[in-house]
Swiss-Prot record:
Record-listed Phosphoserine modification sites: 48, 51, 136, 411, 626
Compositional bias annotation for Low complexity: 514-528, 552-574
Main location: nucleus
PTM annotation (N-acetylalanine): residues: 2
Protein name: Far upstream element-binding protein 1
This protein's UniProt keywords: Acetylation, DNA-binding, Methylation, Nucleus, Phosphoprotein, Repeat, Transcription, Transcription regulation, Ubl conjugation
Chain positions covered by the region annotation Disordered: 1-24, 40-92, 443-528, 545-574, 625-651
GO MF annotation list: RNA binding; RNA polymerase II cis-regulatory region sequence-specific DNA binding
Matches recorded under Pfam families: FUBP_C, KH_1
Positions with biased composition (Pro residues): 464-501
Source species of the chain: Mus musculus (Mouse)
Annotated InterPro entries: FUBP_C, KH-I_FUBP1_dom1, KH-I_FUBP1_dom2, KH-I_FUBP1_dom3, KH-I_FUBP1_dom4, KH_dom, KH_dom_type_1, KH_dom_type_1_sf
Length: 651
């Protein structure tokens, strides 16, 4: 383009000169205005404008061809949207960042959380997107892809590290066999173990369902050591941690709730009722025969009473009373009064141990349990499963309820019937009595102390202060009543408590015992072990340190002294005869045992002379005169022989 700035304007005198001057002035004015506008807009940039090309060169954006980065470029003025484009462009270019991060494979569930809550929180707080690989490929770590700005990626890493550190295995925590499974053990106070387990295992079952884990309370043994019990939790690491917090929260809540207690030391809480501790050996007294006592208390007080299940390691069982608060308090007072009344009994007096089963009473008076006793009995092999139960559940339940230890003897005695199984119950007399009652309910009949069932038996083992009691109308008594012992004849009713003996009460008590109606003769059986039983009694009385009270020399004679009817049924087939074994046993101990007395053929044997001889020998013994020979004792019912073997097991 030609440069007209050096061309002089045409003269005013020339043709069209006036018009040329007007155009030149207008151009100058326009150029001046353009420079002013450029100066206002571009500041110093306006200096880059020149007059050549009519000043259009100034319309070009400054620094367009500069080598500076985009951030240094000046956005056009009056363009708010355009002014924001460089920072957004910069952010977009920097957000395209993906980094791989490794996390422990066992912690993936803990990082994700229930329903993805945990990982959603991490993404929201950090602004970083997290993608976890579906599996680890057998490696101990799993890959996570973090996408975001460097700051958001670092924030996500920090949050992931915190979660992994929080869920890192604590003492007792280790990974399970399955993929992603972990096992953690927490210690539960012994007093709170029942709270965590709940009635019938309901509480621990609910905890397992809510947390989605498996919980097992580890019990080393039945002994109550007072030590904390480990609770093993197995499952996903995050769920295991949640389950642990739920258990600790349960213990804290219940512990605070139990701060409100009544006069019995038990918590009170509206519909929760009252918890009354009952000595384990006294549970049978509160329940009563066939539950009669506890039913009476419930009816009188208008409440419901249930014994909470436990592991059998505590000295007390908890009776839970539910109902209106005032009635619960009344029922608790009834139970407490019942226990106090029994504990306040006269020492040496008759106790409630008979239960109307033909058993003699001991001198326990509901006090603290004394020394442990042992009771052996046999049951048919076909009924063994009823006592043991599936997986031993029944026998464990009976042991927990009664507090006694029940065992099936794997090594039966010699010459034992292979069709019978021998069980042993160990515990206090009260525990044994309660366990025996529960076992009889399971098998639907009375247990047999080391022998087949018989309709009659003795009251119990004679104590050092009196001769043996005559056979009573109930089932055989187990040899677990501790001395001092005061056996006596049964009351007028089959379930009445036995009457105590006075030192001179044999003469008066014996006729009263004669008035008992004879049992069904068809149920009686001959006993081949009578000689062994007679030898046992003679030897037993010679070992007593304190002689029994004197008895009349001439006691009334009767043909029913053995508690049997007029007819004697033949001995059952296959009956094992232990007479020779017992004779050999006493021979070794220096005791001569005569042959069993013969019985007249046919009909009921007459033992009047034998009983008269027995009392004469007793009178001679009480007078400090040793008998010259062993009295001929009458054959005893089968229960006597079994009783002797059971008592021999104790001593």
């Amino acid at each position: 383009m030609a440069d007209y700035s050096t061309v002089p304007p045409p003269s005013s005198g020339s043709a069209g000169g006036g018009g040329g001057g007007v155009v030149n002035d207008a151009f100058k004015d326009a150029l001046q205005r353009a420079r002013q506008i450029a100066a206002k807009i571009g500041g110093d940039a306006g200096t880059s404008l020149n007059s050549n090309d009519y000043g259009y060169g100034g319309q070009k954006r400054p620094l367009e061809d500069g080598d500076q980065p985009d951030a240094k470029k000046v956005p056009p003025q009056n363009d708010s949207f355009g002014a924001q484009l460089p920072p957004m462009h910069q952010q977009q270019s920097r957000s395209v960042m993906t980094e791989e991060y490794k996390v422990p494979d066992g912690m993936v569930g803990f990082i994700i959380g229930r329903g993805g809550e945990q990982i959603s929180r991490i993404q929201q707080e950090s602004g970083c997107k997290i993608q976890i690989a579906p599996d680890s490929g057998g490696l101990p770590e799993r890959s996570c892809m973090l996408t975001g700005t460097p700051e958001s990626v670092q924030s996500a890493k920090r949050l992931l590290d915190q979660i992994v550190e929080k869920g890192r295995p604590a003492p007792g925590f280790h990974h399970g066999d399955g993929p992603g499974n972990a096992v953690q053990e927490i210690m539960i106070p012994a007093s709170k173990a029942g709270l965590v387990i709940g009635k019938g295992g309901e509480t621990i079952k609910q905890l397992q369902e809510r947390a989605g884990v498996k919980m097992v309370m580890i019990q080393d043994g039945p002994q109550n050591t007072g030590a904390d019990k480990p609770l093993r939790i197995t499952g996903d690491p995050y769920k295991v941690q949640q389950a642990k917090e739920m258990v600790l929260e349960l213990i804290r809540d219940q512990g605070g709730f139990r701060e409100v207690r009544n006069e019995y030391g038990s918590r009170i809480g509206g519909n929760e009722g009252i918890d009354v501790p009952i000595p384990r050996f006294a549970v049978g007294i509160v329940i009563g025969r066939n539950g009669e006592m506890i039913k009476k208390i419930q009816n009188d007080a208008g409440v419901r009473i249930q014994f909470k299940p436990d592991d059998g390691t505590t000295p007390d069982r908890i009776a839970q009373i539910t109902g209106p608060p005032d009635r619960c308090q009344h029922a608790a007072e009834i139970i407490t009064d019942l226990l106090r009344s029994v504990q306040a009994g006269n020492p040496g007096g008759p106790g409630p141990g008979g239960r109307g089963r033909g058993r003699g009473q001991g001198n326990w008076n509901m006090g603290p349990p004394g020394g442990l006793q042992e009771f052996n009995f046999i049951v048919p092999t076909g009924k063994t499963g009823l006592i043991i139960g599936k997986g031993g559940e029944t026998i464990k339940s009976i042991s927990q309820q009664s507090g006694a230890r029940i065992e099936l003897q794997r090594s039966p005695p010699p010459n034992a019937d292979p069709n019978m199984k021998l069980f042993t119950i160990r515990g206090t007399p009260q525990q044994i009595d309660y366990a025996r009652q529960l076992i009889e309910e399971k098998i639907g009949g009375p247990v047999n102390p080391l022998g087949p069932p018989v309709p009659h038996g003795p009251h119990g083992v004679p104590g050092p202060h009196g001769p043996p009691g005559p056979p009573g109308p109930g089932t055989p008594m187990g040899p677990y009543n501790p001395a001092p012992y005061n056996p006596g004849p049964p009351g007028p009713a089959p379930h009445g408590p036995p009457a105590p003996y006075a030192p001179q009460g044999w003469g008066n008590a014996y006729p009263h015992w004669q008035q008992q109606a004879p049992p069904d003769p068809a149920k009686a059986g001959a006993d081949p072990n009578s000689a062994a039983w007679a030898a046992y009694y003679a030897h037993y009385y010679q070992q007593q340190a304190q002689p029994p009270p004197a008895a009349p020399a001439g006691a009334p004679a009767t043909t029913q002294t053995n508690g049997q009817g007029d007819q004697q049924a033949p001995a059952p087939a296959g009956q094992v005869d232990y007479t020779k074994a017992w004779e050999e046993y006493y021979k070794k101990m220096g005791q001569a045992v005569p042959a069993p007395a013969g019985a007249p053929p046919g009909g009921q044997p007459d033992y009047s002379a034998a009983w008269a001889e027995y009392y004469r020998q007793q009178a001679a013994y009480y007078a400090q005169t040793s008998p010259q020979g062993m009295p001929q004792h009458p054959p005893a019912p089968q229960g006597f022989a079994n009783h002797a073997r059971s008592h021999h097991h104790l001593y």
